[in-house]
Design a protein with these regions (language model features):
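Short, low-complexity N-terminal intrinsically disordered segments enriched in polar/charged residues
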Residues: 1-24, 28-32, 44, 48-50
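Short beta-strand edge/turn micro-motifs at domain boundaries
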Residues: 89, 99-121
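Ligand-binding grooves and catalytic loops that recognize ribose/phosphate and carbohydrate rings
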Residues: 26, 34, 55, 117-121
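Surface-exposed, charged secondary-structure patches
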Residues: 6, 35-98
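Functionally constrained cores in energy, signaling, and assembly domains
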Residues: 10, 18, 23, 29, ...
Length: 121
């Protein structure tokens, strides 16, 4: 599998794994021991507020039986920049709700999301 295809598959493991609460797909998407999500949520007043959380903790929330995932519609990869054999960046439109950027790393031959930065649209 070419790097671009493997990166795309990893991003969609995250996107679809989140929507279906699929722990296996989520853990395949992230470098779980080091990955973080950082971004701007809109607070109750509609103002952007900076937020950060480790993915190890976030995956636990997402697979909880009580958790209800947001519905995003279709996700779209807007760009992929592979800048070395072990590093890449991806810009992803999360169904028009969020604009995500991913820092990707290649670990043991597999592309993983190391960090995600997002802005609530």
């Amino acid at each position: 599998m070419q790097d671009y295809d493997a990166i795309s598959e990893t991003v969609f493991h995250y996107f679809e794994g989140y929507q279906t609460k699929d722990r296996e797909r989520l853990e395949r998407a992230f470098a779980v021991d080091v990955a973080n999500m950082i971004g701007y949520w809109k607070n109750n007043e509609g103002e952007l507020e900076l937020f950060t959380i480790p993915y190890k903790e976030l995956i636990e929330r997402w697979v909880d039986p009580e958790f209800i995932p947001q519905e995003f519609g279709d996700g779209n990869i807007l760009s992929v920049h592979i800048f070395s054999d072990v590093g890449a960046t991806v810009v992803f439109d999360c169904g028009g709700k969020y604009l995500d950027t991913f820092q990707m790393v290649k670990l043991d031959g597999d592309w993983k999301i190391a960090n995600k930065f997002f802005v609530d649209q």
